[in-house]
Amino acid sequence: MREKLEALLADAVAELSQVSTEDGLQELRVKYLGKKGELTAVMKGLGALSPEERPVIGQVVNTVKGELEAKIESAGLKIREDIKAEKLRSERVDVTLPGRRRPIGTRHPITLVIEEITAIFAGLGFLVAEGPEIEHDFYNFEALNFPKDHPARDMQDTFFISDTVLLRTHTSPVQIRTMLKQAPPVRIIAPGTVYRCDSDATHSPMFHQIEGLMVDKGVTFGDLKGILTIFINQLFGQGTGVRLRPSFFPFTEPSAEVDIACVICKGKGCRVCKNTGWLEILGAGMVDPEVYRHVNYDSEIYSGFAFGMGIERIAMLKYGISDMRLLFENDLRFLKQF
């Protein structure tokens, strides 16, 4: 019986050395230690032994069983450690590898132009002012000297929400709001979104403007021309030709359209400038005394100028964009160029 137990232990240890999985280990445990296992079968034979042999062999059985259980437990621990090590190896992260590059967006050309224009005027001492896009008739028209029968007040040109509330058609209302809150001197620019009933290759029902205002004692038309010339030369390059043509705006007098030498043909004449050599980019003029009356400024003491430009038009000229609608279509093939 003793020899049989020793042989059984040797066989179990030999098989155990070949086991590499937890399932295999469980099969071996059942084979030798289960209810119908080989060691259990030996233990059932103890009853056939003499009273003298029974305690001796019983001691051997317990020793074999304890040793086998210990070896199985040790093998199980090693298998679990091997599994854990393999998992760690397979899931190892090489921190020296470069990270995956994510596609990076770019700023929209409209944003780029607004930022550049804002920076130029900041260098000239202008602050940025803002106002609501849903505006009252008083700020959008009345305080800016638009007569009641002015075409801009018609439904085909303006998005009216009610008889006196509308989507602002320009950012000039910001100038009125600023002057009502602030005594001179005033030096601001007002970038923002504006709305008009218009849509084609060169017009959009929603577009962007930057308007500027400077009010102080002794401000002249010469100051206006000087400021705009500096701005144009910084935006389009030194030496860019500038000319002012007489025009009319309800809120300025005198008024002027400001042209630059065509950025495409350098003033020689082409299809873009209709062979004139010039491109209109903004309107400007000296603030009308009637506007001062609405904001309680004394026009005998203070004078000033205002100007306004469409950002889309500036962007089209600066980047050579032929169709304004490209600026609003969110086509990444177009936007990635900036």
Curated annotation (Swiss-Prot):
A Pfam cross-reference name: Phe_tRNA-synt_N
Catalysed reactions listed for this entry: tRNA(Phe) + L-phenylalanine + ATP = L-phenylalanyl-tRNA(Phe) + AMP + diphosphate + H(+)
GO cellular component: cytoplasm
Location (main, coarse): cytoplasm
Annotated binding of Mg(2+), by residue: E253
Keyword set includes Ribosomal protein: no
PANTHER family: PHENYLALANINE--TRNA LIGASE, MITOCHONDRIAL (PTHR11538:SF41), PHENYLALANYL-TRNA SYNTHETASE (PTHR11538)
Family: Belongs to the class-II aminoacyl-tRNA synthetase family. Phe-tRNA synthetase alpha subunit type 1 subfamily.
Subunit field text: Tetramer of two alpha and two beta subunits.
Protein's name according to its UniProt entry: Phenylalanine--tRNA ligase alpha subunit
